[in-house]
C-alpha cells in the first residue's frame, strides 16, 4: 500500500510489532488472528467514522488490502 502518509514509518512499524507481539503471546493461529484483526477494523470503523462515510472507508480499506496481497509471495 505505498502512498504518502502523515505517520512515520517508524511509528507504523512499532505499532505493527506491538500488535504482532500480542498475537504471538496468545499463540493465535492465522485464522484467529485474521478474525480478531477484522473485528478490530470493524470496531474502529463503526466507532470512529461517521455513518455516512463508513461504506466508503470499508471499500477503500478492502481495495488497499487486496492490492497489497501478492499471490506469488511465499509465506
Curated annotation (Swiss-Prot):
* SS bonds (residue pairs): none
Sequence similarity: Belongs to the UPF0352 family.
- List the protein's name: UPF0352 protein YejL
Database matches in HAMAP family = UPF0352
Q: What is the lineage of its organism?
A: Bacteria, Pseudomonadati, Pseudomonadota, Gammaproteobacteria, Enterobacterales
Gene field? yejL
What Pfam families does this protein's entry cite?
A: DUF1414
